[in-house]
Amino acid sequence: MTSPRTILSGHDIAPKKSLGQNFLCDPQAAEMIVRKCGLSKADVVVEVGPGTGALTIPAAGQAAWVYAIETDGRLIEPLKETVRAAGLDNVTVLHRDIMKTDIREICREAGRKLVVLGNLPYYISSQILMDLVEKREAVDRAVLMFQQELARRIAAPPGNREYGRISVALRYCAELSTVARLKPNLFFPRPGVDSEVVRIVFRPWPGNRDCDEALFFAMIKSAFATRRKTIKNALSAGMTKISPSAWEELLVRADVAPTVRAETLDVGDFLNICRHYKAMSGNISTKEA
């Protein structure tokens, strides 16, 4: 593959730090990452942030179709040129912000669940992950690169200081595995830390069909919004439909000590709190909650 440095310099493009741009420049690493997707000729891929096409080209060689979604308009023509040079006719390059793109529409058009692939910039990785969680009916699996710090947060267990909202959300609805670690010298420009490749296989229904998911996600957001507060104080500050004293009673009923912090609770604890909240608060709207 033509190196990202060569492609960028040929178009007088400098990487933007504000977009977290670190381009994968090792073809063997790119092939390995795409292999971890387990693609077949029936699969439709959505690639987030294709850049200069390091992952796009091998993915298109194995999948039925690739939708390459790039927010940086400067990279659109270079990416299209790379696709044409590879002789591929199964790639759609889209100049869009992934956070303003409803992948469920692509899923409906494709007629099957999607495989999501990408090298995600640190500044927006958590938002993209939560968006995938909430739209997971459209996604079968994802293989994503993250800076090591975020990868550790994703995989952190309860009780770990890295454990947080995204850890709970993914444990609720997916199986995760770290499949590779990449050194900074495999990117241009070099990031300051290692990157990790995480494979995520989504479970559309995690066995909790009675769970109000919107309420569940609102609850974990409130629980981790102020990490140093006790779970009672965090939830009563973020979800005010019931009083702090009622929150204490609710938590005791849910077999959760009101004085612990959110980082000590597992998915089952949050689901139990959620069920007791619904029972105590009655039929209130999640938006109001």
Swiss-Prot record:
<dbReference type="InterPro" id="IPR020598">
    <property type="entry name" value="rRNA_Ade_methylase_Trfase_N"/>
</dbReference>
<dbReference type="GO" id="GO:0003723">
    <property type="term" value="F:RNA binding"/>
</dbReference>
<comment type="similarity">
    <text>Belongs to the class I-like SAM-binding methyltransferase superfamily. rRNA adenine N(6)-methyltransferase family. RsmA subfamily.</text>
</comment>
<dbReference type="InterPro" id="IPR020596">
    <property type="entry name" value="rRNA_Ade_Mease_Trfase_CS"/>
</dbReference>
<keyword id="KW-0489">Methyltransferase</keyword>
<keyword id="KW-0949">S-adenosyl-L-methionine</keyword>
<keyword id="KW-0694">RNA-binding</keyword>
<protein>
    <recommendedName>
        <fullName>Ribosomal RNA small subunit methyltransferase A</fullName>
        <ecNumber>2.1.1.182</ecNumber>
    </recommendedName>
</protein>
<feature type="binding site">
    <location>
        <position position="24"/>
    </location>
    <ligand>
        <name>S-adenosyl-L-methionine</name>
    </ligand>
</feature>
<dbReference type="GO" id="GO:0052908">
    <property type="term" value="F:16S rRNA (adenine(1518)-N(6)/adenine(1519)-N(6))-dimethyltransferase activity"/>
</dbReference>
<dbReference type="Pfam" id="PF00398">
    <property type="entry name" value="RrnaAD"/>
</dbReference>
<feature type="binding site">
    <location>
        <position position="22"/>
    </location>
    <ligand>
        <name>S-adenosyl-L-methionine</name>
    </ligand>
</feature>
<dbReference type="InterPro" id="IPR029063">
    <property type="entry name" value="SAM-dependent_MTases_sf"/>
</dbReference>
<keyword id="KW-0808">Transferase</keyword>
<dbReference type="InterPro" id="IPR001737">
    <property type="entry name" value="KsgA/Erm"/>
</dbReference>
<keyword id="KW-0963">Cytoplasm</keyword>
<feature type="binding site">
    <location>
        <position position="70"/>
    </location>
    <ligand>
        <name>S-adenosyl-L-methionine</name>
    </ligand>
</feature>
<comment type="function">
    <text>Specifically dimethylates two adjacent adenosines (A1518 and A1519) in the loop of a conserved hairpin near the 3'-end of 16S rRNA in the 30S particle. May play a critical role in biogenesis of 30S subunits.</text>
</comment>
<feature type="binding site">
    <location>
        <position position="49"/>
    </location>
    <ligand>
        <name>S-adenosyl-L-methionine</name>
    </ligand>
</feature>
<dbReference type="GO" id="GO:0005829">
    <property type="term" value="C:cytosol"/>
</dbReference>
<dbReference type="InterPro" id="IPR011530">
    <property type="entry name" value="rRNA_adenine_dimethylase"/>
</dbReference>
<feature type="binding site">
    <location>
        <position position="97"/>
    </location>
    <ligand>
        <name>S-adenosyl-L-methionine</name>
    </ligand>
</feature>
<keyword id="KW-0698">rRNA processing</keyword>
<dbReference type="InterPro" id="IPR023165">
    <property type="entry name" value="rRNA_Ade_diMease-like_C"/>
</dbReference>
<feature type="binding site">
    <location>
        <position position="119"/>
    </location>
    <ligand>
        <name>S-adenosyl-L-methionine</name>
    </ligand>
</feature>
